[in-house]
Amino acid sequence: MKREFCIFIVLFLVFHIHAQLVYHDASNFPLLGRATESAGARYERFPDSLKNISRAPLWNLSRNSAGMAIRFRSNSTTIAAKWVALFNTHMNHMTDTGAKGLDLYCLQKNGDWRFVNSARPKGKTNQVTIIKNMHPEEREYMLYLPLYDGLVSLSIGVDSLATISQPLVDYPIRKNPVVFYGTSILQGGRA
């Protein structure tokens, strides 16, 4: 009886430790989609040098993180995120998930990016489990940032016993940047 109790306690502790999440600052991982590395804030698209020469509406839109994504690799069974929205945007014609949520994609063996799930925001400060109960194997991820809001901070949560590291695959390739400028139809927010 005593031996069974000890085994139960050990198993309970192992599963409890495994279930805990550890959060890692996303600024430690590659950020895709910025015009330049010299932008003022980490999750803004334009450098501060453009502030005084840009129209105010354009400058304000540049503070949204649309088109930007974080790349990382992990063997975690759970991926979570903590983030603070810059403006806490709400729109009548779009859900908060579309405006200030996050979208997680996983790189498949055939080279395609597959949608995993969205992190649905509850307010300005958020903590969401994006996916859980996965098989523990190394995967490449891309976490897309909010379309119509910016970020103050972002952390990625993984199992306490899992690894999280720099991506091994340089994909999408970033050698020759392409700039798109247009309306929300181009962005995909409205049609």
Predicted regions and their residues:
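Bacterial Sec-dependent N-terminal signal peptides
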Residues: M1-L21
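A generic structural micro-environment signature
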Residues: I7, A162-I164, Q187, A191
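N-terminal secretory targeting modules
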Residues: A19-P177
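Catalytic nucleophile-elbow at a beta strand-turn-alpha helix junction centered on a G-D-S/GDSL motif
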Residues: K175-A191
